[in-house]
C-alpha cells in the first residue's frame, strides 16, 4: 500500500525540484546578459526584501525585452519597405534619421546606434590624403562673399587635400581667383569654369527662383567639369559645414551600383502641395529632395546619358508647369520621381535646412547631430527658427574667423607648392633675421589676402575718354569719412580697406545700413586683410590703384574732402591740358582745418576768405612745410590758369595722373615717405607737375594714427625708415640712371 504513495511522492519532489532549478537558471541567465548576478539574491532567498528586489529586476527585464522586440519589428518593417522600393511612400514617410544612409556594414548596429545621432567613432572617412572635389556655382558680388564663409567652414574642419571647382561669371572669377591666389592655402587647388559658356544649356528654361539662370547651372556639371572627374560634392553658397567634409565624401562608398545621386530629403512641405490653396509644385517623391548638398557620381551620370535625360524631363514637365519655382531642384526631383532607384538618400543632418515652412528641428536633438547648415531662405540669417540664434552664432564664427589661420599644412600629405608660395619662401630665406630692420623687409614681401569688390560695383566709364576715379585707402578708424566723400565726389571711387575679417563684417553692416553708401554702385570696396605688425599703406594703395576701370585716377587720402564739383572740373582740365598725349600730373592744392564741424567753402573765393580768417590753413604748414610748399600757394591765390612747378625734396602733393602711372613702392610701410617716394618716381619718369588754379581739397581733423606714434617714439623705427630711403635712392639710380642722382643729392642737402 505504501509503495504506490511513496512513488508518487518521489515524482512530486522531483517535479518541484526541476521547476525551482529551471526558474533559478532562467533568472541567472537573464540577468547575466545585463552584467548582473543573482548569487547574492539566492543566498538571501528567505529575505522579503530580496524577493521584492528580484520581482523589480524581472519586471525591468521584461520591459527591456519588449522594447527590443518592438525595435526589431520596426527595423524589419523598414528593411522590407526599402527592399520593395515603392514609387512614392518610401521617401515621403521615412523618419529623418541616420538609418536612411545605412550600408551593408551597418547591419549589426542596434536601433539606438542608428538613431539620429552622429557616431564620430563609426563615421566613415575618406582615405588619408585622398583628393576631395567640391563644386559650386557662384555668380555676382554677394555670392562671392557668401562662398568665402562656406570655404572657411570647410577648411577649418578638413583633413584632406581639396580641389574646388567654381562655375563663375566674370565678376566672381575676378574676385575668387584673386582671393585664392593671395590666400595661398596649402593642399588646395582651384579651377574656374565660365558660366557664360553654359548659359545656352539652361537659358530656355523659365525660372521664377531668385537665383536666376545660375540656379539651373548644376544641371550642366557633367558637361562643365573635366571628363576625367568621376565624383564631386556639389554645394550651394549658403552652406556652413560643422564637420569634416571627408565624412560626406565617404558616403560615395555606400552607393549601390545603380545609384548616381546622393541627396537629403526636403525638410518642408513644399512638394506635398499643401502650403497654400491651389499650390501646385513640380512632381517629387513624397517630400522630394533638396539640392543644396549633392553627391554626384559624374562617371555614372555621363554613362547613362544624364544630359539628355534631364532635358527630356524638363521639357515634359514644362508643358504643364510652364516654369520652375525652385530652379534645378524642381528638375532633379521630377527626374528622381521617374527613376527612384538612382537616388541615395543621405541622413538629414547633411543638409539641415533653415527656410520658411521647414521642419528641420526634427532632424537633430544635440549639437553633435549637426553636420551641414543650409540657409536656403531669401531671408538668410533673418529666417524664423526656434534655434536660429545658435545657428547664426555658428555661421558668424566662420564669417569673422581669421582666414590667415587656415594656411596650415596638412602633415603627411605631399602637395605641390604654388608659384607664389615658392617665390615668397625663397624671398624669406634670403632675409637676415639678425637685421635690425628685418620686420620692415619682411613686410615688403608679405602677401596679404585680398577680396576685391566686397560690395556690388556697377560702373562703365564715360565714352569721351576723360573719366577719372578717386583712389584712396583707409582702415577701420577712418570709416566715418566715407559718406562725406561720396557727397563731395559723384564720380567712381576705388577704396582699399585694411581690415581684419571681423572688421570687414562690421564695415559690411555699416555700408548696408547707410542710405548714402548703399545707393552708390560706382564705389569699389577692396578688402586687404590684416597681417603683420605694420600698416602696409602702399600695398593697400596699389590694390585700389590696380582696380580702376577709368583712364585717369585722382590719388588722394580718405581724410580729405574734395571741393564740390571737382570731378567735372578735373575732366575738363584733362581735355584742356591734353593729358592723353602728354605725361602730366595735375596737382590739387591741399588745405586743412582743425575744426570737426566746418562750413565747407563752395568756391575758391570762399576758401581764400576762410584762409585769411584763420579757419583754414595750407596743409601741414606748421608741421611739414616741405611736403606742400612747392605748390606755391602765394601764386595759386591769384592764378587763373594752370602753372608748372618743379619737384623739390619731400614734395608729396595729391595728383591726377593716367591709370598706367607707376605704382607706390611697397617697401614703405606705416608712417613716412610712402607718398614722397611715389612723386619722386613720377618726376624720374619725366611727368610735368601742373597745379590747377581752381581746384582744392581740405583735410579733416582726426586722432594721430598708431604708426605716426611709433615713428615719433621709436629710434629703431626712424633708423629703419632712413635705411629704406637710402635703398630706394640706390634702386632709383639703377632704374633711371644718372638722371636720378639729383634725388640723392637733394636728400643729402636737407
Swiss-Prot record:
Binding locations of Mn(2+) 2: 557, 559
- Write down the glycosylated positions: 116, 142, 228, 266
Q: Which sequence ranges are listed under topological domain Cytoplasmic?
A: 1-10
Provide the membrane-side ranges marked Lumenal in the record: 32-750
Q: Where is this region: Glucuronyltransferase activity?
A: 408-750
Q: What class of enzyme is it?
A: transferase
Q: Which cofactor does it need?
A: Mn(2+)
Which stretches does the entry tag as region Xylosyltransferase activity? 132-407
Function, in words = Bifunctional glycosyltransferase with both alpha-1,3-xylosyltransferase and beta-1,3-glucuronyltransferase activities involved in the maturation of alpha-dystroglycan (DAG1) by glycosylation leading to DAG1 binding to laminin G-like domain-containing extracellular proteins with high affinity and in a phosphorylated-O-mannosyl trisaccharide dependent manner. Elongates the glucuronyl-beta-1,4-xylose-beta disaccharide primer structure by adding repeating units [-3-Xylose-alpha-1,3-GlcA-beta-1-] to produce a heteropolysaccharide. Supports the maturation of DAG1 more effectively than LARGE1.
Q: Which family does it belong to?
A: In the C-terminal section; belongs to the glycosyltransferase 49 family. In the N-terminal section; belongs to the glycosyltransferase 8 family.
Q: What is this protein called?
A: Xylosyl- and glucuronyltransferase LARGE2s
Q: What is the lineage of its organism?
A: Eukaryota, Metazoa, Chordata, Craniata, Vertebrata
Per the record, the gene is large2
